[in-house]
Amino acid sequence: MVRQPEPDNLFSPLQRGVAAVRSPSVMRKPVSLLAALLLTTDFASGAIETPKNQPIEITSTGQTTYENGLATARDNVAIHIGDTDIYSDFAQYNSQKHEVFVEGHVRIYRDVNLYVGERAVYNIDTKQIRAEEMRSQYDPYFVSGTKISSISENAYLVQNGMFTTHDTPDPSFHLRAHTVRVYENNYVVFQNVTFYVGRVPIFWWPYVYQSLNDAFSFSISPAFLSSWGPSLLTQVAFPITDKIKGRLRLDYRTRRGPAIGFEANIDYGKDDSSWAKLKTYYIQDQNPLINRTSVPRGLVSTGRYRVSLEDKTNFTDDVYAIVDTTKLSDPFVMQDFYQGEFRIDPVPDSVVSVAKTDPFYTLTAIARFRVNEFFEQTERLPEVVLDIKRHALFGGPIFYEGETGIADLHRNFADGSGFENYSTIRLDTFHQLVYPNTYFGWLSVVPRVGFRETYYGETRDLGKTLFTPSDNPLVPDFLLPDPTAAKPIKDGGSTYRTVVNAGVEASFKMSREWEDAQSRFLGLDGLRHIIQPFTNFSWVSESGPDPKEILQFDRFEPSTQLRPIDFPQFTSIDSIDHWTVWRVGVRNRLQTRRDDLTVSWLDLETYVDVNFDNPYDRTPYSNLFNKLRFTPLPWAALVINSQLPALDKGFTEVNTNIVVQPVANVQLSIGHRYLNQNPFFNNSSLFVVGAYYRVNDNWGVGVQEQYEATIRTLEEQRYSVYRDLTSWVASLGAVIRDNGGVKEYGVLLTFTLKAFPKFGFDFNFDPGSSGN
């Protein structure tokens, strides 16, 4: 509801886009001035018409007159013309000047903007407003002044203006300017402007430009990080064109020096369906060898930079191209200045691809190349793949799927690593037939059979070289050391490899319901148990060269999880060996009703591999896997993903996460990651504990602890306090990190403007965690 403003020059709570609706009194007792005007000779042919042929409708509940070209109305006056609606206590329309004078509780709605004041003059031809002590809203901003006049159809000059985003008569902050020029949905220009917090002046500017475009934002971030020292990070985002939005970064770090960056987001193409993102950054680093980790570094130059480009171009509805590339000055620039991105992607990729999609196939051409010589990269220069999607052959019960590709592959090791690069041409084609069917109305059986043929232009000549395989059954025999200058790869010439695969999947479901299973404490309103046993038998025969002779590109990668045993889901083409594996398991699901919906109360999936012949796990049985998710109540959840060597030798992994919100203002979380005796990863027993307490409407506190028990190290501590400042949200926190014996300390202080979160002062003492 829009509250009536007080007559003094204060800000009033306003709503954006409120529809113009006649007051109840107008609807109860309408007296139409339009009807009276129709009886005069000047308007005998119809309604009042403006030069633009827009009729004016004036209604009120009081006296209405029309004399000498002046139409007057009193009490609950409502005027409607085009996209403009005007409400007041008194109104007078001059048919010669085409102006409406309104007085008393004036409200002018035009498009989605609202103007509120005591008196105003509105020109129906130019749509200009002249007023004193008027207030207006341009979401999320509020503007007022002692005098407002139009300087164009969508632009206004405000004298002695005030500007804020705080929706209250007494804003906690505002800008007061001698003059304010407002250009609707575009920008605002202030002259001789002072920034106030409450009634206290804080800062003065002779001139301020403020965009109303959602692409505009700014932040000033005093920052501290152990490796930076006291710093000032600033960034301004602004629209360059309607399709291009830019961001300029100007930073200074006392231990590092000045830095500059530019970023751009571009929308283009049909319906703006294509886009591009550019990121650039350069710093003249005064201390490039500063290292707050325990990992030693080599020589790093002082001129450090990153240039990144992401792009997706939609040429047609079924043809598109993707570009993703990053050029870095050194291997540590992302770790030092873009810690948020570094934690997600420490080794940026460089790929260009073009794809043609179809309901039956996808044709993709990929070029993957190395632009940073200090990183290892498997290049594809290029690779072209035709992927045939599973579909029925000639409309029958048998389905076909396959993929065929050719690739020029190069494995390039990091410069200075001591390893020797290698390459080959690979032609690979895979074809498979599938016969899904349901028997007895409940048993799903899906047999499959396929073959793969692969050509390699280069192989490894093992000769008389002996390699000692690992005695760990979880390490494949064909994993050989990477080539070095002392032990280079001997060319074994070209070769062909044939792979035949067959298998069958089967599953069925059973269910039972218990309507009398009722428990408010456990969140039960009836219970349904669904059990689904499943099995997957996979047989693969490989004939051709010894798998050790195959040069590795799409290769075996260490993982704690079971690998796919089906094609084409198994993508490590160069690590294919013969295997016979039977995967068997059961899914249990308990469902209940909640808010008239069926929800999962408990899910448990249990499975194990029987390894008749498995090159990736030479034990008779894999670990026993259990995936549990228990959600007894909307505010409580337990997730446990575990694998245990229950049937044979192996390793142990248990990941546990508990989240509860017992009352509305308290949330607790406990996580534990346990890993033991895996041959590829270090043992770990990591505890992560977090809590948040909302003290009241204005205060909140949070804490998070991360402890690695195997090395008895408290790796990270975070403590924070949150304060709601009505129109701002402030947070104060402390951070302590142990980077392998080298500790970092920081304090975090941020202010976020609730009405427009992109604007604010960011006192950010942990910039890495916020993505800077």
Which ranges hold each PLM region?
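Ala/Thr-enriched low-complexity intrinsically disordered regions
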Residues: 19-20, 40-44
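Charged (often Lys/Glu-rich) extended helix/loop segments that serve as interaction or gating elements
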Residues: 47-164
